[in-house]
Amino acid sequence: MSLVRLNISRGVTGTLPTSNYVQGSGDLVRVGGASATGQNVGHLAIDSLFSSTYRNYLVVGYINLLSDSSQIWLRYRKNSGTTVEGSGYKFAFHGTNVSDSVSNISSSGGDSKFRLSGGTTSNDGYPSLYFEIKIFNPAISSMITSIHTTFSEFDESAVLTRYSGGGFNTATEAHDGLYFVPNSQNLENYHINVYGMKDS
C-alpha cells in the first residue's frame, strides 16, 4: 500500500487561531482570580476584574466549604469596593442529578444574590461547587450585567447535581468584580480564574 504525503501548509493563509489559558496569547486573557487552601473565611471578594478592555468574561473555578449544608451565593462588586445587594438579581437555573431527578433554582421576582447551589458537602475530596460562568457587559454603565452559567454541586451525601441557566441584575451600571459568599458556613478552599474575551 502506497503512502500519501500531505502538505498541510498548501492553501493555508493567515494565522491559525489559538487559545492559551495560561499565557493569555489566544482569545482568552487572564485578568485575575484567587486561590487558597485551609481557609476559614466568610466570603471572597475579587476586585479589579472588569474594564473597558474586554466586553465579556469567563470565570472558571471551584469552591470547598468548611462545613456541610450551605448554599453558595454570587454578587457583583463596584469599583468603589462595595458589594451590590438589594433585590435586583433575577435568575433561572435548571438541574438534573445522577438519579435523573430534576431540580430548579430560581428567583421568583427579585433577589439579593445569584444562588449557585443547594446544601453542599464539605468533603475536601469533592468540590462543594465547580463552575463556568460567562459574564456579559459588566463594565458598561448603560447596560445590565448578565450571566450564563453551567455549574455542578455535591450535596451533603456527595450526590452530584448539574445546573445550567442564566441571570442578570436589573441595574444599568458598571461592575468591577465578584463576591462569593456562603449563606451559613465558611469558605475553606477555592481556585478561581477570570479571563477577558478578545473581540478579535
Residue ranges: model-predicted function:
Residues S2-S200:
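Surface-exposed molecular-recognition determinants
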